[in-house]
């Protein structure tokens, strides 16, 4: 097994809060898949949830070497948690096609947040 991609992103949570105040849930609907959106809507801290998912998806897109665009959208990257609460990343559509081009088999993700920031790192392996 070899590393075929790595990406990191950091998001200022206040920026997400400002976007949410101005645009309501438009950003969330653009970034989150349906299951993620359902979790977001029930979250006690929706801005923090969205900031972490945004950072995670940007990190995943960077690991793919495309960023968001060039055939990869936010909707092609799904972040959820396993039974122990650890985050996991799954790829579909254009993101999955790009992962396969890289001969990637699996993505590992770490997400963290503190008062002002959310950060995520994704490592792709063959």
Curated annotation (Swiss-Prot):
Record-level GO BP terms: fatty acid biosynthetic process
Main localization (coarse): cytoplasm
Binding site for Mg(2+): 9, 58
The enzyme's E.C. designation: 2.7.8.7
Pfam families per the UniProt record, alphabetical: ACPS
Named cofactor requirement(s): Mg(2+)
GO molecular function, one term: holo-[acyl-carrier-protein] synthase activity
Localization of this protein: Cytoplasm
Top EC class for this record: transferase
Catalytic reactions of this protein: apo-[ACP] + CoA = holo-[ACP] + adenosine 3',5'-bisphosphate + H(+)
Coiled coil: none
Keyword list, A-Z: Cytoplasm, Fatty acid biosynthesis, Fatty acid metabolism, Lipid biosynthesis, Lipid metabolism, Magnesium, Metal-binding, Transferase
GO cellular component labels: cytoplasm
Membrane-traversing stretches: none
Domain of life assignment: Bacteria
Functional description taken from the UniProt entry: Transfers the 4'-phosphopantetheine moiety from coenzyme A to a Ser of acyl-carrier-protein.
Family under the similarity heading: Belongs to the P-Pant transferase superfamily. AcpS family.
Name recorded for this polypeptide: Holo-[acyl-carrier-protein] synthase
Organism in which the protein naturally occurs: Shewanella frigidimarina (strain NCIMB 400)
């Amino acid at each position: 097994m070899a590393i075929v991609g790595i990406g990191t992103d950091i998001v200022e949570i206040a920026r997400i809060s400002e976007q949410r105040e101005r645009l309501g849930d438009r950003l969330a609907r653009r970034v989150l898949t349906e299951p993620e959106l359902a979790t977001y809507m029930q979250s006690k801290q929706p801005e923090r949830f969205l900031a972490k998912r945004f950072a995670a998806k940007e990190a995943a897109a960077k690991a793919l070497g495309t960023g968001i665009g060039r055939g990869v959208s936010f909707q092609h990257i799904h972040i959820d948690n396993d039974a122990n609460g650890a985050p996991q990343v799954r790829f579909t559509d254009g993101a999955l096609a790009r992962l396969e081009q890289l001969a990637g088999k699996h993505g590992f993700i770490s997400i963290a947040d503190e008062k002002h920031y959310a950060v995520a790192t994704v490592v792709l392996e063959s």
